[in-house]
Amino acid sequence: MSQNIDYSKGIYDARQLGAGRMLILGVQHMFAMFGATVLVPLLTGLSVSTTLLCAGLGTLLFHFITKGKVPAFLGSSFAYLGGFSIVAPMLADADGNLTIANTQMLPYACAGVAFSGLVYLAVSLLISTFGIRRIMRFFPPVVTGPIIIAIGLILAPSAISNCQANWLLAFVALGTVIVCNIWGKGMVKILPILIGVLVSYAVALVTGAVDFERIASAAWFGIPLHKEAMGLFAIDGSPEFISALFTIIPIALATMMEHVGDIAAISATVGHNYINDPGLNRTLMGDGLATTLAGLLGGPANTTYGENTGVLALSKIYDPLVIRNAAVLAIILSFSPKFEAVINTIPTGIIGGISFVLYGMISAIGVRNVVENRVDFTNSRNLIIAAVILVSALGFNSVGGLTFVVAGVSINLSGLAIAAIVGILLNAILPGNDYEFDSADGADAPSSGNLQV
């Protein structure tokens, strides 16, 4: 039955391809998200297995809430790395490299992630009640763009710190990612992070920079949940918990707009306006609840992945069932500590090289956000909002944020939190807010690109 299939117009029901091809397509989607998804736990100290479990479960939950209509995969969000670096910064090992997880503070960071997902849910309900155009006026590109720029700049020092562990591996990883992005074709262009890790890992093997001791002692099967990292058990009303909320929740204000761009990109690829059907309220709700689930279980925030949108465009297989197959495969892999041990052997220098370009790309995507939305910086209003956001984020971050006491509880506002609050307030107060969001044009909106935030 699958011998005479016309791929030119796209395949919307992959069952006609047969079980074997559907499985291969699912594996392809899993590899598309893999490099970026496992990099986040390596940069934050979270469990790779828990991250894969949360990506798989989050994707299935998203598909359930969106009625199985949207062919999107949810993986780890890079945008939240800035929040993790503030709430639970990696600790230095004996050689001075930032490789040790901050186990004391990670649960609070995950709790912040869980509550940030509820922001998506709240905005989803507001959109259902008041309409999408009224709500989106509070989150224009002149606010979200500079916040994304600041996230990348705040992370830059940690990238250099990791590179210093092994500059050779860092340059190989960095160079490979650049070559794949600029000159790569087809799947090579879609998988720059994964290929960068594989090539630099091969160099690490040749130079003897890989330690296999942990692999031999790891079990083949294990439960991918670790109580000590779960955000569920960190919701305790402590100053650490409150400060984590104020630090991480504002990031959701920026990532929501990236979500809109990604859904628009999927719409343009498939030829169906998912912003209208099943509706942005449902896609936001699905993404938000997936993020809340991940945070409660001790995983990073989830986000729709641009890499998988690229796979859709290449393969022309648009059936969401294929994405759900990839989600199930990710869940299966999460139950293997042996697999996690292999991932954890990736040298710090490689992580540094990948994050070198990755963190820069986060800031560059923020620039792209304001450029593609034609933000007019000859307008003093827009210039002031962007300037105050950037200085607030970077300036307060350099001095440890702003600490104050409310009802006997010490609360610390990070630079990102202050920047988001000030940006939204200035946008609401200053005259001249002419931003209009048009869901009918959603399929033409800019996406966040292949290096997903």
Give residue spans per PLM region.
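Membrane-embedded helical hairpins/re-entrant loop segments and their flanking transmembrane helices
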Residues: 10-20, 42-63, 67-69, 249-320, ...
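Juxtamembrane interface elements at the cytosolic ends of transmembrane helices
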Residues: 6-7, 34-37, 173-180, 191, ...
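Hydrophobic, membrane-embedded alpha-helices of multi-pass small-molecule transporters
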Residues: 20-35, 169-173, 191-192, 223-262, ...
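Short, non-helical or kinked segments that cap or interrupt transmembrane helices
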Residues: 46-51, 68-81, 135-144, 189-195, ...
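Membrane-embedded alpha-helical modules
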Residues: 105-213, 327-439
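Intrinsically disordered, low-complexity non-transmembrane regions of multi-pass membrane transporters
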Residues: 1-24, 212-232, 268-275, 283, ...
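Interfacial segments of multi-pass membrane proteins
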Residues: 85-91, 181, 308-323, 329-334
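N-terminal signal-anchor module of multipass membrane proteins
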Residues: 1-74, 78-103
